[in-house]
């Protein structure tokens, strides 16, 4: 097996983990819809970032980017629509459709490498609202609706994407994977610390997803 083939294997594994990470978050929202702390802005930006990575994969011939990001767009959109929010689901769906359409049109008008770096930029910014909310959860010791399993899978996915990027010399993916992985570690640590003092309490909703 060549280095290139091994790298593609890591890419497909990263894509599979990226798709799987959405499932625990959806399950947690459905089971505990009243829990706060999940950022709809973060998940909406995740939809846009994955749409850009999908377009980048189409234009660059990076096949591992295609199935995972397409499914992740659908999964992240489901999270946005399922979570409790003062904004109606119809309006959220319309905003996702308009934003996605504008980004997709832009992605086909700029150079391929620029699409990769735009996807990296959107992906990086997508974690900031959730990171901000999780800092608040940590300070208030809130057992939030954020799924720890989702962020653990996200970290594992980014490690695989980094291995893919190193094996294929794909700079945009390498930079994006490093930043997303480190942010994921910070998120996981904050949410774990926020829940630690509550262990043993009969009122705590434990991590079931």
Regions found by a protein language model. Give the residues of each.
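Alpha-helical membrane-protein topology signature
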Residues: 1-209
């Amino acid at each position: 097996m060549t280095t290139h083939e091994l790298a593609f294997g890591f890419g497909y594994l990263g894509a599979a983990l990226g798709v799987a990470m959405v499932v625990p978050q959806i399950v947690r929202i459905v089971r505990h819809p009243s829990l706060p702390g999940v950022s709809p802005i973060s998940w909406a930006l995740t939809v846009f970032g994955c749409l850009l990575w999908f377009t980048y994969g189409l234009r660059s011939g990076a096949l591992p980017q295609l199935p995972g990001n397409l499914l992740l767009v659908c999964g992240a959109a489901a999270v946005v629509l399922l979570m409790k929010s003062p904004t109606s689901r119809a309006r959220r769906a319309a905003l996702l459709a308009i934003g996605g359409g504008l980004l997709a049109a832009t992605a086909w008008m700029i150079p391929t490498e620029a699409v990769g770096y735009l996807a990296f930029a959107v992906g990086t910014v997508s974690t900031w609202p959730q990171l901000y909310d999780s800092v608040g959860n940590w300070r208030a010791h809130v057992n939030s609706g954020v799924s720890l399993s989702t962020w653990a899978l996200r970290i594992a996915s980014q490690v695989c994407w980094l291995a893919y990027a190193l094996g294929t010399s794909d700079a945009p993916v390498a930079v994006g994977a490093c930043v997303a992985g480190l942010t994921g570690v910070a998120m996981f640590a904050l949410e774990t610390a926020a829940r630690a003092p509550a262990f043993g309490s009969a009122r705590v909703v434990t991590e079931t997803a």
